[in-house]
Structure formats: C-alpha cells, structure tokens
A protein has these predicted regions:
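Internal active-site segments that recognize and position negatively charged phosphoryl groups
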Residues: 43-62
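Active-site flanking loop/helix segments enriched in acidic
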Residues: 23-42, 86-90
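Charge/polar-rich, low-complexity and marginally structured segments
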Residues: 10-16
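Divalent metal-dependent catalytic cores for phosphoryl transfer on phosphate-bearing substrates
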Residues: 32, 56-171
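Prokaryote-biased recognition of long, low-complexity C-terminal linker/tail segments
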Residues: 170-189
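Internal, conserved structured core segments that host functional sites
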Residues: 18-22
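Single conserved hydrophobic/aromatic residue that forms the stacking wall/gate
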Residues: 1-4, 8-9
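Short, conserved glycine- and acidic-residue-centered signature motifs
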Residues: 1, 40, 95, 99
Length: 189
C-alpha cells in the first residue's frame, strides 16, 4: 500500500472545486441508489463515514488515498447525467459512462498540477477505475490494492443499504416492502 504517502487529500480533490454546484446537487444514479436531488453528495458523505470505520478496523491502508477515492469515485456522474432533477444520460454519458469520464477529468487535473506521472495519481486513478469491482459491472479494471478493494466494498454496501433503509422506513411493521430495484426487485420484511 501507500501508507505514509506525501500527497495529502487536499492535493487530490481540486477537481471537486471545479464542479461544486453539480457535485453537491446531482443524484448518484438514475434509478439504482441515491437517485434524488443531492444524492451524489449524500452517497459520498455516507461512504466517508463507512471509510472511517474501515480504517479503524483494517490496518495497512493509506487513509488519504481511500478518502480521495471516496470523494472522486463518482465525479464523472456530473458529466454523465444532464442535471440534478429528472436526469437523462448525456451523449458522453451514454458513450463512455461515469468511470471513464471521471478518469478523464482526473487526468486533466493531474496534468494541470504536474502530478500525472506520480504513484499517487496512478493509484487514485486505479481506485476510480476499479470501484465497481468487477469487469461485468463496468469497471475497466478490478481492484488490485487494498484501498481499491475497500472503496469497492464501501460503495457496494452504501448502494445496497441506502435503498433498503429508505424502503424499510416506508413499510409497515410486519409487512413486506415494495420490490427494491437495487436488490433485483426483492422485497424485504
């Protein structure tokens, strides 16, 4: 891992400051999870809380790298979707998807900061590239470092648990929920 890396989190997240309005109002998805106004920001916030716990429990990770991965893993959604309310996919979103778009955004920022040949940039790019975990789920690469596995598991947990939590709050005690899209339309008790 990159424990003790010199590059700190503030050097990695300049990208967010370039799209602040979009990042904080866009949904995280169109239908699967956090598909509401400011869902992307809330998804990121939830993931940061989970990352804190992962770092407490599992030793050997670079906290700055994991936090930066959480903050930037879905940055491409701000160009993949048309807007914060009732979004559609942009042409770029349809053709490339948020992972590739996010990698492009990260590459531009890294080149502007002259850090595009650093290990930190390469490993952060790996986290963005691999956060869906498996090729069949849209990741161009599968996780290869501890922080990438952690990011994938954190993202997966939040994307599954948030819809369960939202649905259970709407379900009467002793009844089954409506089918949950992100759980292959399973209902929960």
């Amino acid at each position: 891992g990159l424990v003790g890396s010199e590059m700190c989190i503030r050097d990695r997240v300049g990208l967010i400051s370039k799209v602040p309005d979009d990042y904080f109002v866009f949904p995280a998805a169109m239908s699967m999870h956090h598909n509401y106004f400011n869902g992307l920001a809330y998804h990121t916030y939830s993931m940061l809380m989970l990352a804190d716990k992962f770092l407490e429990v599992y030793e050997g990770m670079n906290a700055d790298l994991l936090y930066a991965g959480v903050l930037l893993h879905d940055i491409g959604k701000t160009k993949e979707l048309t807007g914060p309310r009732s979004p559609l996919y942009t042409e770029e979103g349809n053709l490339l998807g948020h992972i590739v778009i996010g990698l492009q955004m990260l590459a531009i920022e890294a080149a502007e900061q002259h850090v595009d040949d650093t290990e930190e940039y390469k490993t952060l790019s790996h986290l963005v590239a691999s956060h869906h975990g498996e090729l069949e789920f849209g990741s161009p690469k599968e996780p290869a470092i501890m922080e990438a596995f952690a990011l994938h598991f954190i993202d997966l947990a939040d994307s599954k648990m948030a819809p369960i939590s939202a649905e259970i709050l709407k379900t009467q005690k002793g009844a089954y929920s409506s089918p949950i899209t992100s759980l292959n339309r399973k209902s929960i008790y």
